[in-house]
Regions:
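N-acyltransferase acceptor-side catalytic subdomain
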Residues: 1-162
């Protein structure tokens, strides 16, 4: 992979033209987040020597308030692994991702309480880079209930019906 420069963009006017159809990493979503209270969008852009964009990731810095105990904190959230140039190989894509991940981690180390990545298409994508940057996996429990196997009246007990 050629030398890649990674930069962080916080203003929609500074975003270069992008390719890709992933709505979670689009310029339009960035502009919507700019207008949303308590959310600050951050675009991580990787370009090669020629200035061509080889990858980008949209992150959101969210300001949260909790009542007990009362405090304000921020966290960074990213959906998916980002968008990449179609001409780069999977190995190069993972290297570009590693550079963008390291840049984002350094930038968020003093600004956010935690950084959360979710909805990765391949659970092993970038695993080595996540581990070297101090991330760890959290297994969430998913519950899927099927309401189509029985009629609603059959699901209720006799106490609930009367």
């Amino acid at each position: 992979m050629q030398e890649v420069e990674v930069r962080i963009i916080t203003n929609s006017n500074d975003i270069p033209p992008m390719e890709g159809s992933n709505v979670f990493h689009s310029r339009q979503l960035f502009c919507m987040y700019e207008q949303t209270p308590r959310i600050k969008p951050i675009m991580i852009v990787a370009t090669n020597r020629g200035g061509t964009m080889v990858g980008h990731v949209l992150a959101t810095l969210r300001y949260r308030w909790t009542w007990l105990p009362p405090f304000l904190y921020t966290h960074c959230r990213i959906y998916g692994e980002g968008c990449y140039d179609t001409q780069i190989s999977d190995k190069d894509k993972e290297e570009v991702f590693g550079k963008m991940l390291a840049t984002l981690t350094r930038a968020m180390s003093y600004r956010a309480l935690y950084v959360e990545w979710s909805n990765l298409s391949n659970k092993l994508f970038g695993y080595r880079h996540f581990r070297t940057n101090g991330y760890f996996p959290v297994h969430w429990m998913s519950i899927h209930n099927s309401l189509h196997s029985m009629a609603p009246q059959e699901r209720l007990s006799s106490k609930r019906i009367n």
